[in-house]
């Protein structure tokens, strides 16, 4: 099937690792009334249509929503709604698919949208993806601003450590605030956050070309070799300006 898309969504469709992880999860978990939030081109709704009784694809951008409507027009059990999921009036849902992911859930609306949508999920309902694991590692950089490091161009100064797991089926926090201890093999002046997505039990997807690029957060001070404790906080869905990190 050939999809009509914008250039950006064409890149999303070309990220085969991302699509495979979601397709496998959807094939084993989607059922009943399924919502696809932030549906984009409609590809995940297309996957879900084979397994769910009814799929409602919600997309707030009118241009890509029109594309999704055209892409899914031949499927009798799929409807496309051009509306913001933060304001949509849901019916009781059996499955919620929401791929508004970003590294550590900082710069996309995955958490704000799900916090509202979960109020309408049945007690035995399912969320795809299931969870995200966030990890950090020390790195050395020659810049001062937060930036993505898609190609892992900055060498690591120590091992990666998982510092948080966010489960999407339950009470979602808006803010992460905590400390993490990193082991550095050499002095460092930044941390790199890497997120891994659990789309369903046993299906884990790391950063892909179009999902969760590693994020580098420079520090004002330089950390010494050995164990260093970092204070880290951010608002999920609050954007990169909400990030604060410092050496304790």
Swiss-Prot record:
InterPro entries: Arg_MeTrfase, Methyltransf_25, SAM-dependent_MTases_sf, UCP006607_RNA_methylase-rel. SUPFAM superfamilies: S-adenosyl-L-methionine-dependent methyltransferases. Pfam families: Methyltransf_25 (PF13649). One of its GO terms (molecular function) is protein-arginine N-methyltransferase activity. To M.jannaschii MJ1452. This is Uncharacterized protein MTH_738. It comes from Methanothermobacter thermautotrophicus (strain ATCC 29096 / DSM 1053 / JCM 10044 / NBRC 100330 / Delta H).
């Amino acid at each position: 099937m050939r999809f009509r898309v914008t250039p950006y969504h064409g890149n999303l469709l070309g990220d085969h690792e991302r699509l495979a992880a979601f397709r496998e999860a959807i094939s084993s978990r989607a059922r009943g009334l399924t919502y696809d939030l932030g549906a984009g081109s409609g590809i995940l709704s297309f996957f879900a249509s084979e397994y769910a009784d009814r799929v409602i694809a919600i997309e707030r951008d009118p241009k890509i929503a029109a594309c999704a409507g055209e892409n899914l027009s031949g499927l009798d059990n799929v409807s496309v709604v051009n509306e913001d999921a933060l304001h949509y009036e849901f019916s009781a849902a059996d499955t919620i698919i929401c791929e508004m992911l970003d590294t550590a859930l900082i710069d996309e609306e995955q958490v704000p949208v799900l916090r509202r949508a979960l109020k309408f999920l049945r007690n035995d309902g399912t969320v795809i993806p299931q969870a995200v694991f966030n990890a950090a590692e020390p790195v050395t950089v020659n810049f001062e601003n937060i930036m993505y490091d898609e190609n892992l161009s900055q060498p690591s100064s120590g091992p990666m450590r998982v510092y948080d797991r966010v489960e999407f089926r339950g009470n979602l926090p808006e803010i992460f605030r905590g400390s993490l201890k990193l082991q550095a093999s050499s002095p460092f002046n930044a941390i790199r956050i890497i997120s891994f997505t659990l789309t369903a039990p046993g299906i884990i997807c790391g950063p892909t070309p179009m999902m969760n690029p590693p994020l580098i957060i420079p520090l004002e001070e330089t950390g010494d070799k050995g164990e260093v404790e970092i204070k880290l906080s951010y608002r999920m869905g609050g954007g990169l300006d909400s990030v604060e990190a410092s050496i304790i």
